[in-house]
A protein has these predicted regions:
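Alpha-helical bundle segments that constitute or directly flank the non-heme di-iron/ferroxidase center
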Residues: 395-407
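Terminal regions of secretory-pathway proteins
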Residues: 9-396, 414, 419-752
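A generic structural signal for short
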Residues: 2, 401, 576-577
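Hydrophobic faces of stable alpha-helices that mediate helix-helix packing
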Residues: 406-410, 585
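N-terminal secretory signal peptides that target proteins for export/translocation
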Residues: 1-8
Length: 752
């Protein structure tokens, strides 16, 4: 079944006044506009047809609300009409002040709401078709309307200068397209959105009826079966989540008290609910929640994004993080937050010397400002951690990864200070940051992605790293922005791998104990016990991950974010389904087609792609294979040979990582950039392995397997001593500013 069967088959032609540059997109003739703003009644957009004359399919019926009539062969949307819609929206929507932080969620969200309200007004008034909303409205030059008065400067007027160090907010990653890959910009799309009303309402069935409840899909398709993977360790989940939090965090209304949970929706009367409430309803016969008389889980929709130039169009959410791997988990996405994390001495990050008297390494700094944000505190004397990314305390294992890379930054800064004693704090910090980001990129593409995707997918999508020399693959035409299907579905693959309990192991690789995953969510307090950090890292390298399949642990389907003393929590799988639908993500089958995989019109045609029992379950709750949610179908697929993932998720994830590499002007392998490493420095970065990071940034661990994301094997993945020289170390002498003059000092410093 093709996308056009779901979308409307009949499209009216769009034409813009003026003849400067014309092109044809999806059969719609589009021409750029060159009209003075002050001309009364001038057309911003001309629709070929009298308006409201087409036959709309079910997904657009809700747009047909106006009684206006249009005569003649064309319909003109004037600048005056857009300004009138703007003034109407301003009566209801308050645009927040940017103050000194123009990337504040509240400010970006309020502008997005205003511009989207104008789009919705025009769509209803003129009865716009799907193609007119998606391809026509975005071509209107809103700088010639009153919208220009509120459009954030970072979306319309950015001046970039080539420099050695990347910005925290991701702006100017591309000099020609400064907002590409920047924080607080729209998610990109591989496929057009499928909204129930054509512009914003969550996706429904292709039959026009509602989809099965998200909780019904969760309990039917994704029960906890507890199968284990044969080779992958929990470390692959830990690194994957650390990467996910470098890439994606959608903007949503937050509870005013804890700043992390969604606004309360279920227990409020309709007139007091936040307009973004989109609750997850629980059936009365739910085997688990009925025990506690729970019939609703709080959930809120994402804010609409202001598009670059504040262009009009359908709702698209915004990403509060950047679209490139830039270590914002360590450093944050604003300069102001980065400053809060710094010591401003020796290029170091602030840390908490919890075990100074034991001679052990520091933990992350304590979160003393808004201490309840993202943290379940047993009492007022206990604190969670502060890091570059707000979700650092989401689960203890994630806090471990944040701690590891913060320690690595400080290790690098101290080493650089010894080699270059004339460097000031700023130079030391930025150089350590630059190297640390390169290490994160290298470990991700050299160790994580090959295990996740497999050799064939890596080669097909150009993800294989070079072993020598520079890689000159930067393409200024590639947008590294995060793909909506990646953020809302594909890169949530790790939920299938989550264990029921997280294990601690000794330095001798012996099991010590385990703790339920749900008891470690927003409760990282075990790390305040001396030596426990190392034990959890030993567990990450020795505990086998769950299998990649449709089975999801009850720790996150029934107990997610469980409150202290409670017997139930939320359902992460339902969240995934609800988020994908409200994003307007097309169904699983549409992405299979995009990736060159077979489309199935019948459930029985799916037997080669996933287990028969899973297909039988799908047929029991969905009306058509095209209705299956992307996340659900993606985790249920049979893995590709040599890969953890099935073909659909492998395709989407590989596409994203290809964009992130080819679209990043600061990518560590590139030549001829102000940020480029020397050939000698680049070869040093290529030496770095996750095993070395663990050896260098833990206290007592002295043996690790060469590839910690895979279970040890005495032949292909042996455990080796940290000090044996088998695991190479990065030689910071290649960063010496005066290498010849200080050669004798370097030999002493480095023990040569």
């Amino acid at each position: 079944m093709e996308m056009t069967r779901v979308m409307m088959p009949c499209v009216r032609w769009l034409t813009l006044l003026g003849l400067i540059s014309s092109n044809v997109v999806f059969g719609i003739q589009l021409q750029s506009l060159d009209v003075p703003f002050n001309g009364e009644g001038e057309c911003a957009l001309i629709l070929d047809g009298p308006g409201k004359s087409s036959n709309f399919d079910y997904s657009l019926n809700l747009l047909r609300g106006s009684s206006l009539n249009y005569d003649g062969p064309n319909t003109c949307i004037t600048f005056d009409a857009i300004n009138a819609a703007y003034l109407d929206a301003r009566k209801r929507i308050h645009v927040a002040s940017p103050d000194d932080a123009h990337f504040k969620n509240e400010y970006v969200a309020s502008v997005g709401e205003l511009v989207f309200d104008i789009s919705l007004n025009l769509a209803k008034t003129y009865g716009l078709s799907y193609q007119e909303i998606e391809k026509g409205l975005p071509l209107i030059d809103t700088s010639k309307t009153l919208i220009r008065d509120v459009c954030p400067a970072f979306l319309s007027n950015v001046e970039c200068r080539a420099g050695k160090y990347r910005r925290y907010d991701g702006l100017c990653t591309n000099l020609e397209h400064p907002t590409w890959g920047a924080s607080h910009t729209p998610f990109t799309r591989l496929l057009g959105p499928v909204y129930a009303d054509g512009i914003q309402a969550p996706r429904i069935s292709i039959t026009g009826r509602p989809l099965p409840l998200a909780r019904v899909v969760s309990r039917t398709i994704h029960p906890d079966e507890g199968y284990h993977d044969h080779a992958g360790t929990v470390m692959i989940i830990a690194w994957g989540q650390f990467m996910d939090h470098d890439y994606t965090l959608q903007g949503t209304p937050l509870d005013p008290l804890n700043k992390n949970d969604p606004e309360e929706c279920c227990n409020r009367p309709a007139h007091l609910k936040h307009p973004y409430c989109n609750e997850i309803y629980i059936p009365e016969d739910d085997f688990f929640y009925k025990l506690f008389k729970v019939n609703c889980i709080d959930f809120v929709r994402t804010f609409p994004a202001p598009r670059p130039g504040c262009r009009l169009g359908s709702k698209v959410p915004f990403n509060t993080l950047t679209g490139v791997l830039d270590g914002n988990t360590v450093y944050g996405v604003t300069e102001s937050h980065a400053k809060k994390l710094r010591m401003f001495e020796g290029g170091l990050l602030r840390m908490h010397p919890a075990f100074e008297h034991f001679g052990l390494k520091d933990l992350l700094p304590l979160k003393v400002e808004i201490p309840d944000e993202g943290c379940t505190r047993p009492n007022s004397s206990m604190y969670c951690f502060e890091a570059g990314e707000i979700r650092v305390n989401e689960q203890l294992v994630l806090a471990c990864m944040h701690t590891l890379m913060a320690r690595e930054h400080n290790r690098l800064a101290k080493g650089l200070a010894e080699i270059n004693p004339h460097w000031d704090d700023e130079t030391l910090f930025q150089e350590a940051r630059r190297i640390n980001i390169a290490i994160i990129q290298h470990v991700t593409y050299n160790e994580f992605l090959p295990i996740l995707l497999g050799k064939d997918v890596m080669e097909k999508f150009g993800l294989t790293l070079q072993k020598q020399g520079y890689w000159d693959g930067y393409d200024s035409n590639v947008n590294p922005g995060v793909i909506d299907a990646f953020a809302a579905a594909a890169f949530r693959f790790g939920h299938s791998l989550l264990p029921t309990a997280v294990e601690r192991w000794s330095k001798a690789h012996k099991f010590i104990s385990s703790k339920r995953l749900s008891d470690l969510i927003r409760r990282p307090y075990d790390l305040f016990r001396a030596g426990v950090f190392d034990e959890y890292f030993m567990g990450l390298m020795n505990q086998v991950a769950q299998a990649m399949d449709d089975s999801i642990t009850q720790e996150v389907t029934n107990h997610l974010f469980k409150k202290a003393g409670a017997k139930f929590g939320m359902d992460l799988v339902s969240f995934n389904m609800q988020r994908g639908r409200e994003f307007g993500l097309p169904g699983y089958m549409e992405y299979r087609k995009f990736c060159g995989l077979p489309w199935s019109d019948r459930f029985e045609d799916m037997f080669q792609s996933m287990p028969n029992e899973t297909i039988r379950k799908y047929s029991s709750i969905f009306e058509h294979p095209a209705d299956i949610d992307l996340w659900s179908g993606g985790v249920s697929e049979k893995p590709l040979p040599g890969s953890i993932l099935g073909p659909t998720f492998a395709c989407i994830i590989a596409t994203q990582f290809s964009y992130s590499r080819r679209g990043d002007r600061f990518w560590y392998e590139l030549p001829n950039q102000p940020s480029s490493f020397t050939p000698e420095q680049l070869q040093e970065i290529r030496k770095v392995r996750l095993a070395r990071l663990i050896c260098d940034n833990t206290d007592l661990i002295d043996t690790v397997q060469l590839y910690p994301m895979v279970l040890p094997d005495h032949e292909i993945n042996p455990r080796v001593p940290c000090k044996s020289g088998i695991i190479p170390s990065l030689d910071l002498s290649k960063w010496a500013h005066f290498p010849h003059e200080h050669a004798f000092q370097l030999n002493d410093i480095l023990g040569k």
